[in-house]
Regions:
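Iron-sulfur cluster-binding electron-transfer modules in prokaryotic oxidoreductases
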Residues: 1-310
Length: 310
């Protein structure tokens, strides 16, 4: 998908017009096995890594934190939703972190999910080589997309035979919300974020839930001023990476979403915001229920008070 996303982004907005054209989309999707009822996320006309290179010197707030954040630019954030990466960057900078965004390869998860281990191993080796050159004692490797970041944490040790370099990297890996909870467990800095005026529902990503549970994302959201947070107690949203895109799985994917999420969402008594950090979860919720859900960093960034960051 990364090559597809790179080309799509380079050719935007033409590529987006093709994806919106029902006839052309059906023809293209028939060749690659995607159900024509699905919509591929629109391709951005710029990548997150390019935005970072062009704008990193514009955000020069006082550095208040000794931790250096190496922000992992996953494929969807980089080429489809750079705004999520930008929002994450702004939130971290506002909290006093030094943030760098390196040019990295795909995490390899798409190849792993299809059993293409040699290709996944090659990508893992390249990423570890790059990361090992820029990491130091004060660094953490932070991910925006749970599935991609947790591929490094959970799968790279087996792919790379538990070598010393990967062990050093693994000890530095965490999701962006986990970092903020770790460093601001007693509360966020005063007058940094506005109050939340709506109830916040959140849906946990399966990979995230299976490894760490949802307690930290709950704690993260509860750091926001005047917030009311409720977790959607459910199983998988039904997307499961590429599973829900595939023609033979589309119907069951939608059934799972409706079975696990419909009652919880439809029974809300008032206006609410829905947060889910997994891109596949957000796509499924949008497609099935017509609700635009947010990454947690989108929510945090929208509440920043400092005009220099908006």
């Amino acid at each position: 998908f990364r090559k597809f996303a790179q080309y799509g982004s380079a050719m935007a907005p033409i590529s987006n017009w093709v994806m919106r054209n029902d006839v052309l989309r059906k023809i293209l999707f028939s060749f690659i096995g995607i159900d024509h009822r699905r919509q591929i996320p629109e391709f951005a006309q710029y990548s997150f890594t390019n935005w970072y290179q062009n704008n990193k010197n514009l955000f020069t707030l006082d550095k208040k934190n000794s931790t250096k954040v190496i922000l992992f630019p996953d494929t969807f954030t980089n080429y489809n939703h750079p705004e999520v990466g930008i929002n994450t960057y702004k939130v971290l900078v506002s909290l006093g972190y030094e943030v760098i965004v390196p040019q990295l390869k795909c995490c390899g998860k798409p190849f792993l999910s299809k059993g293409m281990l040699s290709k996944a191993k090659s990508l893992a080796s390249e990423n570890i080589k790059i990361l090992s050159q820029i990491i130091d004692e004060d660094s953490v490797i932070v991910g925006i997309e749970p599935s991609c970041l947790l591929t490094i944490f959970d799968d790279y040790p087996d792919l790379l035979n538990q070598d010393l370099e990967i062990k050093k990297i693994i000890n530095k890996v965490m999701l962006v919300g986990d970092l903020i909870v770790r460093d601001f467990s007693k509360g966020l800095p005063d007058k940094l974020f506005k109050s939340v005026d709506r109830k916040v529902l959140f849906h946990g990503h399966c990979h995230q839930k299976s490894l760490f549970g949802t307690s930290k994302i709950n704690k993260l959201l509860n750091l926001l001023p005047s917030v009311v947070v409720e977790e959607i107690q459910s199983g998988c949203c039904g997307m499961a990476g590429t599973f829900g895109f595939e023609s033979e799985h589309y119907e069951i994917s939608i059934k799972i979403a409706k079975q696990n999420l419909a009652e919880k969402i439809n029974n809300q008594s008032r206006d609410f915001l829905l947060v889910s950090d997994g891109i596949s979860c957000r796509q499924q919720i949008d497609h099935t229920f017509g609700i635009k859900s947010l990454h947690s960093m989108d929510l945090f960034a929208s509440l920043l008070i400092d005009d220099r960051l908006n």
